[in-house]
Amino acid sequence: MHFDPNKFTVKAQEALQAASMLASSKQNQQIEPEHLLSVMLGDHDNIACQIARKLETPVDTLLSVVDREIDRIPKVTGASATGQYISSDLGKVFDTALKEAEQLKDEYISSEHLFIAMSEAGVKVSKLLKDAGIDRNAILKVLTSFRGSQRVTSQNAEESYQSLKKYSRNLNDLVIKGKLDPVIGRDDEIRRVLQILSRRTKNNPVLIGEPGVGKTAIVEGIAQRIVGGDVPENLKSKQIAALDIAALVAGTKFRGEFEERLKALVKEVQASDGEVILFIDELHLLVGAGSAEGSMDAANILKPALARGELRCIGATTLDEYRKHIEKDAALERRFQTVIVDQPSVEDTVSILRGLKEKYEIHHGVRIKDAALVAAAELSNRYIADRFLPDKAIDLIDEACSRLRLEIDSEPEELDRINRELRRLEIEREALKRELEATGSV
């Protein structure tokens, strides 16, 4: 096969470039499959490395074996060491990769095609891979968990593999790992959200409330209930994925890249047959996210999937942002069912603080009295007018614990102030003494 860079995906081109640089650094005139395999296994983001790890292959051991093979390749120095070329073995790998791409109905040669080709082309690295338990069937079996039913139809196709994993956080996993704070109260709102999620159509709740009233906490509470099995039968197997819009937009330099990522993510959610519920915090960011002049924004990509009921979604935004962005877009607004989240009463805030007390005690290493929790709820409600419960009460407790810990670990503030004043006066006294000595000597 004549080497044509335009037939390769961006990631595959990067791997080939890295292989060329590795060959140069080792003073090898020919670029061999060993160079390519070494750079692919050494890059944790490369799908070849991820497939090998999924197959439970000791990647570091395999990498050291490949590097030993590279050291055996003849070195060329002096006047004859001009120019680099692709070896006949690597040419065979390219031919096999092209056949693999055609067989998988892909339009470009990507990293996984090269990886399969290296195990199949009958070159030296094929034996190394087979000895490590990596062959075509094993790779293809694992590949579906990365690609699903996706095909390589663009040069950036590898960017869209496992989109859900890259651009969202699985709240169910965080609950199992104990990374989320317990959610106390909010039973009415949680029940209303579960009721909307159980509907056949228009099953997309949007939580509307002021900043700090606990909209995200409600969704975390639902994830905790799903993990605990305390939900209707039709929601017991569901996973909640919190979308990271910043990660989705980051690095999209060229027009169409953002849309491609989002479409891949939506396709992955659709392929789960309703098992994944997407949580979009700051829902208003979707209106206009990724849009440049003449291109679609994220909301327009989501609308068809929401309308057909193929995408189940929970949104969260403030009342002002909802009115400014979402209410104006009637087509988007009618896809969602609103759930108003008011700030809790002082009594409910005290209950929430009691539930969080243990987490803060462990973090700060101090004991929190119940009277302090009641005082935090009452005083924050009375004196902090521009913030909302329970957020401002939680902040008060956190701030007080932090201050107490600081005083325990270091000198008390009063003593520290007196010591600093003493040091300042001592420096002043020394300066005056030197001045007096100087005038005395004159």
From Swiss-Prot:
The keyword Kinase does not apply. Signal peptide: none annotated. ATP binds at G209, E210, P211, G212, V213, G214, K215, T216. Residues 344-442 are annotated as: Linker. Residues 5-149 form the Clp R domain. Residues 162-343 are annotated as: NBD1. One of its GO terms (biological process) is cellular response to heat. It comes from the Bacteria. Pfam families: AAA, AAA_lid_9, Clp_N. Residues 8-73 are annotated as: Repeat 1. GO terms for cellular component: cytoplasm. Residues 86-149 are annotated as: Repeat 2. CDD domains: AAA. Keywords: ATP-binding, Chaperone, Coiled coil, Cytoplasm, Nucleotide-binding, Repeat, Stress response. Residues 394-442 form a coiled coil. One of its GO terms (molecular function) is ATP hydrolysis activity. The keyword Membrane does not apply. It is found in: Cytoplasm. PANTHER family: ATP-DEPENDENT CLP PROTEASE, HEAT SHOCK PROTEIN 104. Homohexamer. The oligomerization is ATP-dependent. Part of a stress-induced multi-chaperone system, it is involved in the recovery of the cell from heat-induced damage, in cooperation with DnaK, DnaJ and GrpE. Acts before DnaK, in the processing of protein aggregates. Protein binding stimulates the ATPase activity; ATP hydrolysis unfolds the denatured protein aggregates, which probably helps expose new hydrophobic binding sites on the surface of ClpB-bound aggregates, contributing to the solubilization and refolding of denatured protein aggregates by DnaK. Belongs to the ClpA/ClpB family. The Clp repeat (R) domain probably functions as a substrate-discriminating domain, recruiting aggregated proteins to the ClpB hexamer and/or stabilizing bound proteins. The NBD2 domain is responsible for oligomerization, whereas the NBD1 domain stabilizes the hexamer probably in an ATP-dependent manner. The movement of the coiled-coil domain is essential for ClpB ability to rescue proteins from an aggregated state, probably by pulling apart large aggregated proteins, which are bound between the coiled-coils motifs of adjacent ClpB subunits in the functional hexamer. This is Probable chaperone protein ClpB 2.
